[in-house]
């Protein structure tokens, strides 16, 4: 179906919208410049300066950070890390079990 656009140029429309363009092996929809301009105007209106913080919020933030900063100043234990992460030796060793011969039938346990 061929229709005239607002500018008077003939565009081919498929299902009421312009056909997709292949880019990089995938089909990508071409958006008109009018739609992109509206989106940019809306984003400019919603931008607010975020760098300025209220003084009360800064004080609240410093109170939150004061606790964890004090905890980071603790002394580390003198035992080496390899000793702390080594496997625990059992107090009683398990007896060595001799190998059970292979039986061709299922066993009940």
From Swiss-Prot:
UniProt feature, compositional bias: Basic and acidic residues: 31-50
- Carries keyword Transcription? no
Write down the InterPro entries for this protein, in alphabetical order: DAP1/DAPL1
Query: Which GO biological process entries does UniProt record here?
Result: apoptotic signaling pathway; negative regulation of autophagy; ribosome hibernation
Q: Where is this region: Disordered?
A: 1-51, 76-100
Pfam families referenced in this protein's UniProt entry, alphabetically: DAP
Alphabetical UniProt keywords: Translation regulation
For this chain, one GO molecular function annotation is: translation initiation factor binding
Q: What does this protein do?
A: Ribosome-binding protein that promotes ribosome hibernation, a process during which ribosomes are stabilized in an inactive state and preserved from proteasomal degradation. Acts via its association with eiF5a (eif5a and eif5a2) at the polypeptide exit tunnel of the ribosome, preventing mRNA translation. Plays a key role in ribosome hibernation in the mature egg by preventing mRNA translation, leading to ribosome inactivation. Ribosomes, which are produced in large quantities during oogenesis, are stored and translationally repressed in the egg and early embryo.
- Description of how the protein assembles with itself and partners: Associates with ribosomes; preventing translation. Interacts with eiF5a (eif5a and eif5a2); preventing translation.
- Family of the protein in this entry: Belongs to the DAP-DAPL1 family.
Q: What is this protein called?
A: Death-associated protein-like 1 homolog
Species:
Danio rerio (Zebrafish)
Which gene is the coding source of this polypeptide chain?
Answer: dap1b
């Amino acid at each position: 179906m061929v229709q005239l656009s607002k500018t008077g140029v003939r565009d081919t429309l498929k299902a009421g919208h312009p056909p997709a363009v292949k880019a990089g092996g995938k089909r990508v929809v071409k958006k008109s410049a009018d739609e992109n301009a509206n989106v940019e105007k809306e984003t400019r209106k919603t931008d607010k300066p975020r760098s300025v913080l209220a003084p009360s919020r800064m004080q609240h933030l410093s109170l939150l950070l004061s606790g964890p900063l004090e905890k980071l100043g603790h002394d580390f234990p003198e035992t080496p890390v390899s000793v702390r992460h080594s496997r625990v030796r059992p107090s009683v060793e398990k007896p060595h079990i001799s190998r059970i011969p292979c039986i061709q039938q299922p066993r009940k346990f």
